[in-house]
UniProtKB/Swiss-Prot annotation:
Induction: Not induced by heat or cold treatments, H(2)O(2), dehydration, abscisic acid, 2,4-D, ACC, methyl jasmonate or salicylic acid. Weak induction by salt stress and pathogen induction. GO terms for cellular component: cytosol; nucleolus. InterPro entries: Cro/C1-type_HTH (IPR001387), Lambda_DNA-bd_dom_sf (IPR010982), MBF1_N (IPR013729). Residues 87-141 form the HTH cro/C1-type domain. Gene3D superfamilies: lambda repressor-like DNA-binding domains. It comes from the Eukaryota. This is Multiprotein-bridging factor 1a.
């Protein structure tokens, strides 16, 4: 009876498709220490600006000289005095409060306050809404 006893194989087991260690696994402390003990060469490289967007945000250094040379006063155009007076006059003629006018044109009351105080930056859409709601021409020649 030749078949009795432990079964033995005469070939080596082969593992198919075992993934090689990825870069993160090669960087861990255990692997690095094992490489040091075995005397293998270890190269440590830190990536420059990795995970940041410093290259895109460092644009201030490019135009610094131009900004320093520029002495022009850069401000937004505000509502002219005639326009804010015209808005106030038309609103009071219609006997509307600022909040009522804001509700009619679907804007916040703060927008009307800014226009009437002259702090707002003129917006053509809002001005056209005001013209329609107040029935008065606010832009252009009168």
């Amino acid at each position: 009876m030749a078949g009795i006893g432990p079964i033995t194989q005469d070939w080596e087991p082969v593992v198919i498709r075992k993934k090689p260690a990825n870069a993160a696994a090669k960087r861990d402390e255990k692997t690095v220490n094992a490489a040091r003990r075995s005397g293998a060469d270890i190269e440590t490289v830190r990536k420059f600006n990795a995970g940041t967007n410093k290259a895109a945000s460092s644009g201030t250094s490019l135009n610094t000289k131009m900004l320093d040379d520029d002495t022009e006063n850069l401000t937004h155009e505000r509502v002219p005095t005639e326009l804010k007076k015209a808005i106030m006059q038309a609103r009071t003629d219609k006997k509307l409060t600022q909040s009522q006018l804001a509700q009619i044109i679907n804007e916040k009351p703060q927008v009307i306050q800014e226009y009437e105080s002259g702090k707002a930056i003129p917006n053509q859409q809002i001005l056209s809404k005001l013209e329609r709601a107040l029935g008065a021409k606010l832009r252009g020649k009168k």
